[in-house]
């Protein structure tokens, strides 16, 4: 590396009279040297610059192409997400409507069932009241009959003597005998 640097230093110190060389003093540079340097730079630099620009252009185009592909993919994903969202919203609306109608149906069924149960309870209550009334009426009749029978027995016992009692029995036996003859 040192040899290479030394050779450039020696080139810069060549004598300027009658020879061709590099002038390292920028203020003393002549237009011919500048044009040669610019010509070499343009000749060799043009290809390098074109390659750099082409590479840069290709990278930019690839980046744009990739961005477009990603954009299209993102748009497709967004569209798919919107479709799924609409589908889910539709299903949610159906569940909501079905749920409300199911709730209303259950509510009506519950109301009807409760009404029938209340009606049955009312019928049972009325039947129980009627049964209790009949039982009470029968008990009252039985007591009235027992009291009337006891009163009649008491009255008969106090009014009837043994002789009257025997006559009544004989008359009744006679009536039964007559009835038996008629039925035969």
Swiss-Prot record:
<keyword id="KW-0812">Transmembrane</keyword>
<dbReference type="InterPro" id="IPR002146">
    <property type="entry name" value="ATP_synth_b/b'su_bac/chlpt"/>
</dbReference>
<keyword id="KW-0150">Chloroplast</keyword>
<comment type="similarity">
    <text>Belongs to the ATPase B chain family.</text>
</comment>
<comment type="function">
    <text>F(1)F(0) ATP synthase produces ATP from ADP in the presence of a proton or sodium gradient. F-type ATPases consist of two structural domains, F(1) containing the extramembraneous catalytic core and F(0) containing the membrane proton channel, linked together by a central stalk and a peripheral stalk. During catalysis, ATP synthesis in the catalytic domain of F(1) is coupled via a rotary mechanism of the central stalk subunits to proton translocation.</text>
</comment>
<keyword id="KW-0375">Hydrogen ion transport</keyword>
<protein>
    <recommendedName>
        <fullName>ATP synthase subunit b, chloroplastic</fullName>
    </recommendedName>
</protein>
<keyword id="KW-0813">Transport</keyword>
<keyword id="KW-0793">Thylakoid</keyword>
<dbReference type="Pfam" id="PF00430">
    <property type="entry name" value="ATP-synt_B"/>
</dbReference>
<dbReference type="GO" id="GO:0046933">
    <property type="term" value="F:proton-transporting ATP synthase activity, rotational mechanism"/>
</dbReference>
<dbReference type="GO" id="GO:0009535">
    <property type="term" value="C:chloroplast thylakoid membrane"/>
</dbReference>
<dbReference type="GO" id="GO:0045259">
    <property type="term" value="C:proton-transporting ATP synthase complex"/>
</dbReference>
<comment type="function">
    <text>Component of the F(0) channel, it forms part of the peripheral stalk, linking F(1) to F(0).</text>
</comment>
<keyword id="KW-0138">CF(0)</keyword>
<keyword id="KW-1133">Transmembrane helix</keyword>
<keyword id="KW-0934">Plastid</keyword>
<keyword id="KW-0066">ATP synthesis</keyword>
<keyword id="KW-0472">Membrane</keyword>
<keyword id="KW-0406">Ion transport</keyword>
<comment type="subunit">
    <text>F-type ATPases have 2 components, F(1) - the catalytic core - and F(0) - the membrane proton channel. F(1) has five subunits: alpha(3), beta(3), gamma(1), delta(1), epsilon(1). F(0) has four main subunits: a(1), b(1), b'(1) and c(10-14). The alpha and beta chains form an alternating ring which encloses part of the gamma chain. F(1) is attached to F(0) by a central stalk formed by the gamma and epsilon chains, while a peripheral stalk is formed by the delta, b and b' chains.</text>
</comment>
<feature type="transmembrane region" description="Helical">
    <location>
        <begin position="27"/>
        <end position="49"/>
    </location>
</feature>
């Amino acid at each position: 590396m040192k040899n290479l640097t030394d050779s450039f230093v020696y080139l810069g110190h060549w004598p300027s009279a009658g020879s061709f060389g590099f002038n390292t003093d920028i203020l003393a540079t002549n237009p011919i040297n500048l044009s040669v340097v610019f010509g070499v730079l343009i000749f060799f630099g043009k290809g390098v610059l074109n390659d750099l620009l082409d590479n840069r252009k290709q990278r930019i185009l690839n980046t744009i192409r990739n961005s477009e592909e990603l954009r299209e993919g993102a748009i497709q994903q967004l569209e798919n997400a919107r479709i799924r969202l609409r589908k889910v919203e539709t299903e949610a609306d159906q569940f909501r409507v079905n749920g409300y109608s199911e709730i209303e149906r259950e509510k009506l069924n519950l109301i009807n069932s409760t009404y029938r149960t209340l009606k049955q309870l009312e019928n049972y209550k009325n039947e129980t009241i009627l049964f209790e009334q009949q039982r009470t009426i029968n008990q009252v009749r039985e007591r009235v009959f027992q009291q009337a029978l006891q009163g009649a027995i008491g009255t008969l016992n106090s009014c009837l003597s043994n002789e009257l009692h025997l006559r009544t029995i004989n008359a009744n036996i006679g009536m039964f005998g007559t009835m038996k003859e008629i039925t035969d």
